[in-house]
């Protein structure tokens, strides 16, 4: 198997559900053990990490932890952002996130596909 392009990358995952973060960490670290993986369960913690560290990609829970505010911060830092969705987004939420430059969405029931999903996010020019 080819080495993942995620190896060596710095990833921040933000979700108010610790179980989701645990699954993300297991999936990502299994698929690319040489990447750096940080987590945050609140807006404040995520904002502090975004201010103090550099990341290659940020995974955000769009509806929790003030996801739209964090999306705005990440986009202003020119970071690649992947949005997690627990349910189908309302047309209003989808439109708002798209207008804010979110381009990649993954349903939480597909977390087992996170590594190839993030590889696509990193290699696609939105």
PLM features per residue range, with description:
Residues 7-19, 24-28:
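Conserved acidic segment of CheY-like receiver
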Residues 26-31, 49, 96:
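Alpha-helical interaction/dimerization surfaces of two-component signaling modules
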Residues 58-73:
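Conserved phosphotransfer microenvironments
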Residues 84-86:
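Hydrophobic/aromatic residues positioned on beta-strands within the core alpha/beta folds
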Residues 51-53, 73-80, 100:
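Conserved phosphotransfer cores of two-component systems
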Residues 91-93, 109-121:
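C-terminal output helix
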Residues 69, 76, 88-107:
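Alpha4 helix (beta4-alpha4-beta5 surface) of REC/receiver domains from two-component response regulators
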Residues 4, 18, 25, 39-57, ...:
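Acidic, metal-coordinating helix/loop segments flanking the phosphotransfer/catalytic sites
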């Amino acid at each position: 198997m080819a080495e993942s392009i995620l190896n060596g990358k710095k990833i921040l995952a933000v979700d108010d559900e610790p179980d989701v973060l645990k699954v993300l960490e297991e999936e990502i670290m299994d698929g690319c053990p040489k990447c750096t993986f940080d987590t945050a369960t609140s807006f404040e913690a995520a904002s502090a990490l975004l201010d103090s560290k550099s990341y290659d990609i940020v995974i955000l829970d769009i509806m929790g932890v003030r996801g739209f505010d964090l999306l705005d911060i990440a986009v202003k830092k020119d970071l690649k952002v992947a949005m997690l969705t627990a349910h189908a987004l309302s047309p209003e939420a989808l439109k708002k996130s798209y207008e804010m430059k979110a381009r990649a969405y993954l349903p939480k029931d597909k977390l087992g596909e996170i590594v190839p999903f993030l590889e696509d996010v990193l290699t696609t020019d939105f």
